[in-house]
Amino acid sequence: QSGFTGGAINAVTKSGTNEFKGTAYMYTSNTHLTGNKVEDYELTRNRDHSTTYGASLGGAIIKNKLFFFVNGEYQDNVQAGPSGIARSGANDEWSTNGIVHRPFENTTTVGGRTFVGMNNISQYLSEKYNYNPGRYQGYSLETPSYKIMGRLDWNINNNKINFRFTHTHSKYSSNPSSSTTPFKDSIIYPGGVDGSAGKSSSGRTANTGLYFESSRYMQEQNFTSIASEWNSKWGAINNALRFTYSYQNEPRTYEGGTFPTVDILDQGSLYASFGPDPFTEGNLRQVKTFVITDEFNFSSGIHNFMGGIQFESNKAVNGFMQAGSGYYVYSSWDDFVNNRAPAAFGVTYSNTGDGSQFLANMKYQQLSFYLQDQMNITDNFRLTAGVRFELPIYPELKNNYNKNFAQIDFDGYHYATDQLPSSYQLTASPRIGFNWDLTGERKYVLRGGSGYFIGRLPFVWLVSAVGNANCGQSTYYYNEQKDAKYGQPSFHTSVADMLKDPNLNLPAATDPAAPSGATIIDRDLKMNATWKSSLAFDAKLPGDIDFTLEGIFSKEFNPATVTNLGRKFKGEQEIAPGDVRRMFEYSNANKTDAYYITNAGNSAYYYSLTASLAKTFDFGLHLSASYTRSYAKSYGDGIGDQVNSAYYNNRYSVNGNNDTETGYGTYVSPNRVLASAAYRIKYAKNFASSLSLIYEGMNMGYAGGYSAARYSYTFTGNI
């Protein structure tokens, strides 16, 4: 196997038999099954529910020859919306509980100052621009999903063929992004509200403001897979020819229709947002994968040989336009209504010439061949050894050379936006495993193995080399009016009108400006790999109790990471007695960033030790319990769909983000206890019911988003 360095899921689909069988099922949960009270504090709880309906049917079309199986599932989901609400009057307190926010429902005057109401903003946009920004509080969202699967099995003679089709569609609603990239929050949101302590937060989703429903987005997830397998027998040789095609399509959608992203400030902090999330317009991911594998196996004496050859082709398409519908930041509602120059502005536009969206795409192929021998050394001892060879093939990045960027001097070096790793770098990944029945009765079993596994590079990073080169699309923005290099536009509802604004003087598409944050790929970039070893002991204890003790150790090699060629080490500075910091500055006169996809060091690792007990009783009761202790050091786990977010966020940094360092693994739970009890009752001849109780206790390992997350005293900036 190949293509992963973490966990793998082995999915086996049902098939039809000579007997017609059908099933139907339903699962449900709703608002009332979710708690909303912590001690004496009651949380806002919007309506939500999820009900799953499913059915399957299988049987024979031709007895003993041709079988079918189909399954369908539909989820009726209603997702709770945001919990924040507006003030209904001047006497309402805000910010004290995180629920009531600063904006008012209707225009209100407090202390001689007038605050525009959310209802009044909606009314103005409807009358002026025929635009409905949607709701802003007290709403839920429908996010239905469905899954269908069909399978045919044909027993010809010694040859057997099966065909499988699956399609899933789902979507979920997300809050608007808190990021303002490429803007700088500290500049466009200078902050400060009424001078009150605890009320000076200035982010896009802070409680100083509220956003309309149009600022949310629906992330769709569509996955289609077609697979076929032909099993044949040629004398002593068994052969399996497999074909798989998969299509992953993940567009974003939003309410309200095309409109610019607009942030209205009040005293330097966000007051109201409407229009789409700034990263949603034109945002999509598409990955098409084609795999063909021919695999054989045969036995000779104690040897069971298996070998094969595989060809894989991937095409990744990424649509990403920061401020793709325009992004305006106004210092006040009055500035917006009177069409004054925006305090900050940004837009990404296509260079195709016909106004159509530019879609970055990249192709990647890989040829693999492998051989394995499973040797039955004795009746009690089995040894398996194998090796896999892989040859990656990268195509050229056509029409992706930005000559203006290539002229920038990065501390004595120049880089090209169309460079790629060298193709035809053959890699070998050996692996070995054993299974030893110590007594010959399967009472005590020792098993383990060790192997070197080649993974995959993050395609969304690689394809950004196309999207961020300013060849297919260009981005213009300014954080402050004094930095408006190409001018300040009036307000327009379409990008086409923004580009025609006489106040803007953007570079011609035929001579695109150097990007301010290009993606550069290391010519020597290698596939990430993991060396993984495991050792386990299984025992049947007195009382027919199953006991397992298992240890796992893995070490990372060549994990992909992102550094910034636009920054260089300046020197050390003592900012306080005994507190010496490394300082950095731009490496070029243009003050341009260049995000460099390269390999980190080889110091990341993971280990775990698990002990488990399980027992099944004759009367239908099953009990199990396990404890896992795990530990990991990583280079940041590659978090971030964008190279700039991967560089700045979730990085373990003491000496700057360009000095890749290890820190605690992001998703590893140091301690985890799992216990379960299941009881199955049979009745009325053909019926049975099962009741299960599951307990899980663990330390959260995620880098952010949970109050129980691991605390760290390693930061990415000065404290």
Label the predicted regions.
Residues 1-8, 14-211, 218-224, 233-236, ...:
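Acidic, glycine-rich flexible loop segments
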Residues 394, 516, 526-533, 539-719:
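Short, solvent-exposed micro-motifs at the edges of structured domains
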Residues 24-30, 70-74, 163-167, 241-247, ...:
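Transmembrane beta-barrel strands of outer-membrane/channel proteins
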Residues 11, 55-59, 150-154, 228-232, ...:
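Residues on the lipid-exposed face of transmembrane beta-strands in outer-membrane beta-barrel proteins
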